[in-house]
Amino acid sequence: YQGEPAEALTQLVTFVIRLCGCTATLSSDEVRDLEHRDAVQERIQSHDVRAPYPIVSRTKPWSGVRKSAARLIAKLWADASEAEVLADDDLLDTWQSWLVGLSVSSIRAFRHTASVVALWTIGALSAQLEQVRESYDVAVKQRDAEARRTSSSSISNRTRLAHTAHKMEQLDT
């Protein structure tokens, strides 16, 4: 995402569309143009959507798709958090816009798949939030412990306290 954000978003939205059982393709301009998203979705939904779409299909080639897709979404958001990409509003706004748009579709494959992917996304983002909270709590405890041990004349202790405070500021952003 950091090198080619438009292409990464296009691949991500295309992945969801493929999970719906649709073979339509999107350009990066279509994915990022949120004002005309409804028209693009109508075009996508006019494509032939397979009856047993991959996320619910129990046939042999599709049997593991649901679990694999859930793991991929969780890994994607974990990696995005580590790379500090979650602060990019364009990523989350575009992702949310497509999921919301697809989740209100009249076609069950789109509606169901987008809703499930949205739930996976919420779960993955919640897990990332929990990790940040745990890191923040550890940093606060370290800062408080350092503050108790610090004497006003000790330069090395002040340096450690400043380092811990800096670490907390990083976690806050």
Residue ranges and their predicted role:
Residues 133-146:
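Alpha-helical scaffold repeats of the Armadillo/HEAT/TPR superfamily
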Residues 152-163, 167:
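Flexible glycine-rich, low-complexity coil/linker segments exposed to the extracellular/periplasmic environment
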